[in-house]
Amino acid sequence: MTEVEKKISFDGRDIHITIGRFAPQAGGTVMIRSGDTAVLVTATRAAAREGIDFLPLLVDYEERLYAAGRIPGGFLRREGRPPEKATLISRLIDRPLRPLFPGWLRDDIQVVATTLSMDEQVPPDVLAVTGASVAVLLAQIPFNGPMAAVRVGLVGDDFIINPTYSEIEAGDLDLVVAGSPAGVVMVEAGANQLPEQDVIEAIDFGYEAVRDLIRAQQELLTELGIALVQQDPPPRDPTLENFIRERAEAPVKEILARFEKDKNVRDAALDEVKAAIEQAIKELEETDPVRVAAALDAKALSNTFKEVTKTLMRRQVIEGNVRVDGRKLDEVRPISCLVGVLPRRVHGSALFNRGLTQVLSAVTLGTPGDAQELDDLHPDESKRYLHHYNFPPFSVGETRPMRSPGRREIGHGALAERALVPVLPPQDQFPYVIRVVSEVLSSNGSTSMGSVCGSTLSLMDAGVPLTKPVSGAAMGLIKEGDEVRILTDIQGIEDFLGDMDFKVAGTDSGITALQMDMKITGLSLQVVAEAIQQAKPARMHILEKMLETLSQPRQETSPFAPRLVNLKIDPELIGLVIGPGGKTVKGITEETGAKIDIEDSGMITISASDEDKAKRARSIIMGMTRKLSAGDVYVGKVTRIIPIGAFVEFLPGKEGMIHISQLADYRVNKVEDEVSVGDEVIVKVREIDGRGRINLTRLGIHPDEAAAARAAVAS
């Protein structure tokens, strides 16, 4: 292929698209670059496997540490399992890509995005999303694109396209918008309690930039003489399809019209209809065209039955403005909440129920040393808030092997984490590392937003002083032609058979997280805006129910949580606290039973099983790092004796000398006549000489001063 390069500029920030240079055997290849961040994206297609009734699309995002001039850690010095961030970027690429493939496509498709060079200020994720579209188009795969993505930041009052890491950190918004010529396809955002209207304007602003990238891809295809692939869907047997529809439509319509609130009852009724049709096919003659067609296409019954159910469910919503469980379009399912559902050895817990969706959230408070250290290409080095999401098979009444968390679980945990980070207390006010685990015990839609709600309550139960509580709701969409219905608090069947899953989380002040996924090729900005606005009253209703259970964070943490105290020292004194080879800090730990974490800034966090131990360690460190003044009185221990005096350690790591003339108010012939190694003595700082040597005395100490020194040690 001829080598071609395209440049697109946004406010002086260029994106370079290069094709024809790399990976010539891949179906489609593009190198996409901005600054020094370069991502190679390939798309490859293979023939459909027999018996597949879904699109086997596999998207992998990979990072190479050489991209940042680093060698991997570990014994092998080689990249291993992709970090969580790579999994999230894989999902970010997949989500806007998947709905643009024709629904009938069954070919194996693999998209691989590899970051080959990393600019410490330019994120690679949105480049990878746009690059995936170019690669798929070049691979000549049927695709309703082009598609592109940009990031929108908010610094001050100004929106920025593709902000740097520094601008993202300094701003109040981190939003990714992906779109096609038909409209918005995907939105992912974290925000600092931003008003709905500001978020809507940001999406609008971002989509305008997306359109520029779409035009650039169209121009690129024109230059190369490549047209979008038009391919007809495989033929279907109308005889079999009509047989199934004739026997399914009436009973399915009747079942949906019952407005059954229990999904298990509704699903069982639908399964009975499906089983009856299957039995009717089996009872036909072996030579009957319907039975012959069914034998050739084992998935025909399931697929057609799903289409019938989908059509009738959607028609019921469009024509009757009523949902399968009888709710109005903007009605939230019944909500109930409990806090403290687990014993207090669990530092905080809550159970959140919304309809048949039930999430148990549990909080663990840890020490700064429990923070997650990140080893990837991204600038964050550690995380003090961790949110993990588990979705066991029993939550949907199924059986399957339970393995390590999948992409969906990692993604849902990250969404809940993003929703809550903006309301966490600053580290200097609440130094704990916080881990929340959301266990989905029952699922009928919107478990990620159930995790947000349950986790808010569990954090409050744990005594975490959130600045504001967060609630979340999932919005859905039914679109037939020009008719559009937005659904509040969607359940499983509405997610499965609907066109959109739009999760919105936030406080009463604004949005903290968004995630929108589509099943159609694009959505107008007007409908996106309506969905965001319609979510607010739902969120406020849910929040009201939550606060009826627990109105504010508890004043005390669990008695089983570690006790933490903070202390700030001069960074130049860190070496004094640590001591040679860590001797001093180890000694404090052994003496008090406390754990001590020291940051380069001089911030020290002391943790212990009870507060007295932590305070004792703080007292020792405060004593050894405070500036000494002549006249200060301490309790010390004689460490060694020389002919002219005795050395006394009066603070950890601090020694001074009592000259023989300062041991007593009478003549002392030998130091050993007055003190021995190991003796406890009361000393006063006499002077600190020009070389920093501390001279001590036992003379002139008032009884009150001695008593105060002993009391300080006892405390």
Swiss-Prot record:
Catalyses which reaction(s): RNA(n+1) + phosphate = RNA(n) + a ribonucleoside 5'-diphosphate
EC assignment: 2.7.7.8
Binding-site list for Mg(2+): 495, 501
GO MF entry, a single one: magnesium ion binding
GO CC, one annotated term: cytosol
Record domain S1 motif: where: 631-699
GO biological process, one term: RNA processing
InterPro entries for the chain: ExoRNase_PH_dom1, ExoRNase_PH_dom2, ExoRNase_PH_dom2_sf, KH_dom, KH_dom_type_1, KH_dom_type_1_sf, NA-bd_OB-fold, PNPase
Keywords recorded for this protein, A-Z: Cytoplasm, Magnesium, Metal-binding, Nucleotidyltransferase, RNA-binding, Transferase
Cofactor requirements of the protein: Mg(2+)
Family assignment from sequence similarity: Belongs to the polyribonucleotide nucleotidyltransferase family.
Alphabetized NCBIfam families for the sequence: polynuc_phos, PRK11824.1
UniProt protein name: Polyribonucleotide nucleotidyltransferase
Source organism of this protein record: Cyanothece sp. (strain PCC 7425 / ATCC 29141)
